[in-house]
Design a protein with these regions (language model features):
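A short beta-strand/loop micro-motif in the catalytic core of glycosyltransferases
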Residues: 73-74, 117-125
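N-terminal strand-loop element at the rim of the active site
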Residues: 1, 6-52
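Conserved donor-binding/catalytic core segment of Leloir-type glycosyltransferases
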Residues: 166-184, 190-193, 206
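A short, basic/aromatic alpha-helical/loop segment that forms part
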Residues: 1, 181-186, 199
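A short, histidine- and acid-enriched strand-loop-helix "catalytic/donor-clamping" loop
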Residues: 51, 80-82, 91-106, 117-120
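Carbohydrate-associated surface elements
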Residues: 27, 127, 148
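Acidic anion/phosphate-binding donor-loop and adjacent secondary structure
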Residues: 102-105, 133, 148-165
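Short His-centered aromatic/hydrophobic patch
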Residues: 74-80
């Protein structure tokens, strides 16, 4: 799972303590055990990616029609809410990569048509908020909420000792938190370490 998926899980989990929550999510082969363990309802949508967007929008729209007491819709991507037809409150999360289309292009116009017509936009960082504003998104719709984490109740003693051993005497620490995915560009960070080492001889790079 990526950062946005984890963020949506955290939102769903927290909101389910106060509201009835229905989640429409992509199909995953091991979804049953997970879906049965959470405190909210999950409906999975499979099939080809090209058609999945339209099928998901249809299912969401039908669910809204049948459930008049719905208070709002939260989407993880502007494309996820593009085809949702409702006058209920709409909230859309944004991430820089997903909205970064040159101003005036067709994609940029689609992004603005969606985002400037939702009630609230949640940006995962100030950087993303500033980028959205420069691309034409209405600034007073945007709030910045940095992704949170679940506190760890018990830390493994072996892991703690390994971390202390690794970090001992290393005042300069470079840390990246992400999946080991090519598009995350870990290799560029590793390539930069040679130059950083000359400035910070004790630097240590940790990938989490």
């Amino acid at each position: 799972l990526g950062g946005m998926q984890n963020l949506m899980w955290g939102l769903s989990n927290s909101l389910s303590k106060h509201f009835m929550i229905k989640v429409f999510a992509d199909f995953h082969k091991d979804h049953k055990n997970y879906d049965n363990s959470v405190s909210f309802s999950v409906e999975r949508i499979g099939g080809f990616k090209l058609f999945k967007k339209y099928r998901k929008a249809y299912l969401v729209n039908e669910f809204i029609k049948k459930n008049k007491n719905i208070e709002g819709v939260i989407a993880d991507h502007w494309k996820s809410i593009e085809l949702i037809k409702t006058n209920k409150k709409k909230i859309c999360l944004i991430h820089s990569k997903e909205i970064n289309h040159d101003k005036g292009t067709n994609l940029n116009k689609r992004v603005l048509k969606v985002l400037n017509n939702v009630d609230h936009i949640v940006s995962n960082s100030k950087y993303t908020k500033d980028l959205a504003i420069t691309l034409g998104v209405i600034s007073n719709k945007i709030s910045v909420i940095n992704p949170g984490i679940d506190p760890v109740k018990n830390l493994d003693e072996t892991s703690l000792k390994d971390a202390e051993k690794l970090l001992k005497g290393k005042k300069t620490r470079l840390i990246t938190v992400s999946r080991y995915d090519k598009r995350k560009n870990h290799e560029k960070v590793i390539m930069a370490l040679r130059n950083l080492k000359q400035i910070y001889p004790d630097i240590v790079y940790i990938c989490v």
